[in-house]
Amino acid sequence: MGFIWGDGYITNNARNLGISVHIKDIKHLEKFKDIIPFTGKIGIYKVTSGYKIGSEYSRIIFSSPKMVSDLKRHGLQENKSKIMKPPVDGSIPKEFIHHFIRGLQDANGSICGFINKYGKNIFYTHFLGTLDMLEYIKENIKFETNQKYTQRYENCPVYDCRFTMSKTNLWILDFIYKDSTENIRLDRKYEEYLKIKEFFN
């Protein structure tokens, strides 16, 4: 459900649910199709406006008033990008909240690494969202209360919460990947997590 919270959207008078991802993550939509199940096609399109004009993305959209109604009951909003709120209290059992957060991370976060100019390996992960969403993540992961959020640009309602990964805070990724299975996680980010885990172990 976290992935839908991040990359999904409600259309057509709350009857249709759509999910759009970068073309490189099309396999994740194929997994979603298998779980629903959904027999329609995954569309491939090109961005025509904004700062990624020409880049390709994949999308599925289908009519499911029941699913949309259930998601809205849990707190998903239409036109949510700038006003996204956490799920309604109690709508996600405590033992599944880390799966929800991982879905958000798969949709709107990143896990990556690079070698800096001094030849040192640097790894980081970050969560992206409204202040309400980041506070929800902080409350449930229970990371440091003084962790700072960075506004993406002036007057933007979306903020970034970034961690430079180390042996002492690898538990953050361990937590969100706990009990995850291949059919529900984004392969590309999971592989990055394994690389970081191997490096620090």
Q: What are the roles of these predicted feature ranges?
A:
Residues 1-201:
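Internal intein/HINT superfamily modules and their associated LAGLIDADG
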